[in-house]
Amino acid sequence: MGNIHIQTKSKEYDVYVGKESLSHLTTIVQNMQPSVSNIMIISDEAVASLHLQTVVDALQIDQKVFSFVVPSGEKEKSFENFYAAHTSALENKLDRNSLIVALGGGMIGDLAGFVAASFMRGIRFVQVPTTLLAHDSAVGGKVAINHPLGKNMIGAFHQPEAVVYHTPFLQSLPEKEWRSGYAEVIKHALIGDVKLYHWLKEEVQTLADLRDEKLIHILTKAIPVKANIVAQDETEKGVRAHLNFGHTLGHALEKELGYGNITHGDGVAVGMLFAIFLSEQVYKVNLAYEEMKQWFLKYGYPKMPSDLSVERLVGLMKQDKKANAGTIHMVLMQEYGVVNVVSISDETVHIALEAFQKDMV
């Protein structure tokens, strides 16, 4: 098992990664000061049916433990469920010394974290991720819900007390969720750990290789990339925006295709390829785009849909949180391991997207 220490200006905490990580949960709760009064576990139907009782049983404590379960899917990261969670918290007498446990993937981590950030102006929470994708979202304190006009538009920065990454929970994931999470692993490697990138190319020939010791190795290498960036820039005023590599187009694809019709990781994978495609033009460098494209396709990542309106995508990219005064800002790659946030004109993005779309056919 590998423990990773996270340090930000507002909080320090540990990420527990391994096959026995859940055994730490009781100790984590018992060591909190002031003492935890009661616990609310927030989960979704799919995860709760598999793992909720396991977590309840692992909590060897006297305090009351209750659960709030929402339907599964990104569209459930909504104001309605956020409000309903607050109602449940009030009905079950949560107070300022209570604890919320986020049991699930990124959707649940975001929703539960934002409930924790806002209930009585902020209470403690612990992340218990159940997906590979959540290795990214569970660390760093960004919590949010979606608005019909944009993803993660209503939220806060609220760091967890701990992250308990119990890897056996991941074994029930369908292949599309392994692929989705692996995209964020690739992202961390490309922007911050070139050695990990080369290791992935050698050691992960198929998604089935993302298991056991290789999985733990990947998590203990990818999470520190994010941790190091968050330590420098907790509230995304500077370098933390580098973590959005691939997300400008990725989020636009999610919005245009409809949440749930493309996974977050599939969108980010297409977005990273486009960022590399555009970076070669902007920086006049060779980033081996063709080789990267074939590598991504090998894992089953989708191509850019040929029937999507480039004009609509450009409009959605202008709604991205990095956009400034209506100008698109994208994270582009100067070389492997070196990225920058760059202002790009609508025309440049439009021309590049059209060329990229044709190349992906």
From Swiss-Prot:
Lyase found in the keyword field:
yes
Catalytic activity field? 7-phospho-2-dehydro-3-deoxy-D-arabino-heptonate = 3-dehydroquinate + phosphate
Any GO molecular function: metal ion binding
**Coiled-coil positions:** none
Where does the record place it? Cytoplasm
Cellular component terms, GO, for this chain's entry? cytoplasm
Listed binding positions for Zn(2+) are 184, 247, 264
Q: Which cofactor does it need?
A: Co(2+); Zn(2+); NAD(+)
Q: Which Pfam families match?
A: DHQ_synthase, DHQS_C
- Give GO terms for biological process: amino acid biosynthetic process; aromatic amino acid family biosynthetic process; chorismate biosynthetic process
How is its cofactor bound, per UniProt?
Binds 1 divalent metal cation per subunit. Can use either Co(2+) or Zn(2+).
Instruction: Give EC number(s), comma-separated.
Output: 4.2.3.4
Spell out the PANTHER family in the cross-references.
3-DEHYDROQUINATE SYNTHASE, 3-DEHYDROQUINATE SYNTHASE, CHLOROPLASTIC
Name of the molecule in the record:
3-dehydroquinate synthase
According to its UniProt entry, this protein's organism is Bacillus cereus (strain AH820)
